[in-house]
Design a protein with these regions (language model features):
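Conserved "landmark" site that anchors the functional core of diverse proteins
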Residues: 54-169
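Catalytic cores of soluble metabolic enzymes centered on carboxylation/carboxyl-transfer
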Residues: 1-56
Length: 169
């Protein structure tokens, strides 16, 4: 029956994990969570009008050397030529995760010398730490070392580092 099939598919989608680039898993999860879809009141035109809200950030400009890092990095792979990596300023990186109530090991962006320009597709909370860098959110200055609420569609623009240091998070 339809309800049983939908529940099985929801369960399968919840348990599916694919590492790497963006997939359509989140899209499918949102379709299967839609009340009209679950009620069976949709037609074949449903997907053409379905509003998908991606949980993503668009990189409008990458900055000089922006990378995704985590803590403590990739340890134990020197034997196959992979250095430990991880955030250069582990303290600032971990502090940002703590302010955001993230696990210490949660991934984040490391910006080197000059920052990126990012558009947020979903409401979120961010925190900037590390070397002080020019930063504005929709044209308004952003403070470092504190959490900042970000609305969907907002643009975070980060410029050059001001003062000591080369890495911001």
């Amino acid at each position: 029956d339809r309800d049983s099939a939908i529940n099985k598919m929801r369960s399968a989608l919840a348990q599916t994990q694919i590492a790497g680039i963006e997939t359509n898993l989140d899209y499918l999860r949102q379709v299967f969570a839609d009340t009209s879809f679950n009620a069976g009141t949709v037609s074949t035109q449903f997907l053409s009008t379905f509003h998908y809200q991606p949980q993503t950030i668009d990189v409008l400009a990458p900055g000089a050397f922006t990378m995704i890092q985590d803590y403590p990095g990739r340890l134990g792979y020197w034997n196959v030529g992979v250095p430990p990596s991880g955030a250069m300023d582990a303290l600032a990186f971990r502090y940002a995760n703590r302010l955001l109530d993230n696990p210490e090991s949660a991934a984040g962006l490391e910006l080197t010398v000059t920052g990126a320009t990012l558009r947020f597709n979903v409401e979120t909370v961010i925190c900037l730490t590390g070397a002080p860098m020019q930063a504005t959110l929709d044209g308004v200055s952003v403070q470092f070392w504190t959490t900042v609420s970000v609305k969907a569609g907002a643009v975070l623009q980060m410029g050059a580092i001001q003062g000591n240091g080369t890495r911001s998070y």
